[in-house]
Design a protein with these regions (language model features):
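Bacterial N-terminal signal peptides
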Residues: 6-18
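Outer-membrane beta-barrel translocator domains and adjoining extracellular loop/strand segments
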Residues: 145-150
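C-terminal/domain-edge helix-coil "capping" segments
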Residues: 20-48, 121, 125-126, 136-143, ...
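Short, structured secondary-structure boundary patches
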Residues: 103-106, 152-156
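N-terminal segment of the mature soluble domain
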Residues: 47-135, 171, 179, 208
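N-terminal secretory signal peptides that target proteins for export/translocation
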Residues: 1-3
Length: 214
């Protein structure tokens, strides 16, 4: 009985310490513009709609990556008119370009090039000149214990790191007019055993990268 009381007393102390610590989130990021054509300016973004292509990279998160990019653009840069990923897919399928579109993205995975002829037809179906291609380069989750008493974990630090790349393609020339990348790490510390939502980290990454647009 004495041992049991002692154990639960320690548990109570541990919970008290964890409660005092409270939920905590730390956010670190790095974003940079990798390249930009000399003639690609802010006016180019505002003068026409921009379509968002299906994301490449880590397959399980492709839909979320594209949707979170659209959401971030609408929040931070609402003056840029968008054709979001869902609208784009519908328009591409309506134009009977599904097979060509799939081929173009598949070729990109190995060559890093979007075939100009298909890119042009896709842009016409979407009614845009510029197409932004999101790419998820890396997604990593880590967990570490900060407060542990007699093997009982009270506070865990969970972190998520995500790296993304975005390219803006000009369908008229078939070239990349802008390219940028961002890496963010979001760490959460509390007594809840809940992972940091992927959507939250992705949205933060895109917001930091969007700030680098012209």
């Amino acid at each position: 009985m004495i041992i049991r009381l002692g154990f639960w007393s320690i548990v109570a102390i541990g919970i008290s310490i964890a409660g005092c610590a409270g939920p905590l989130k730390q956010f670190t990021y790095q974003a940079s513009e990798l390249s930009r054509s000399a003639d690609f300016t802010r006016q180019n973004l505002l003068s026409t709609k921009m379509g968002i292509l299906s994301a490449t990279g880590v397959e399980n998160y492709r839909l979320i990556i594209g949707d979170s990019l659209a959401k971030a653009l609408k929040e931070l840069d609402p003056k840029v008119a968008l054709v979001d990923p869902n609208q784009a897919v519908n328009l591409i399928n309506r134009a009977d370009l599904a097979q060509d579109y799939t081929l173009m993205l598949r070729e990109y995975e190995t060559s890093g090039i979007l075939r100009k002829g298909i890119l042009k037809r896709v842009s016409q179906a979407l009614g845009v000149r510029y197409l932004i291609l999101p790419n998820l380069l890396e997604y990593r989750r880590d967990t570490s214990t900060r407060i542990s008493v007699l093997g009982v974990r009270f506070v865990q630090t969970r972190s998520s790191t995500l790296r993304v790349l975005a390219q803006i393609w000009d369908a008229e020339t078939g070239g990349i007019v802008w390219e940028g990348s961002a890496e963010v790490t979001l760490a959460g510390e509390d007594i809840r055993e809940k992972p940091i939502p992927f959507e939250e980290v992705a949205l933060l990454a895109w917001k930091e990268l969007i700030k680098k647009l012209p």
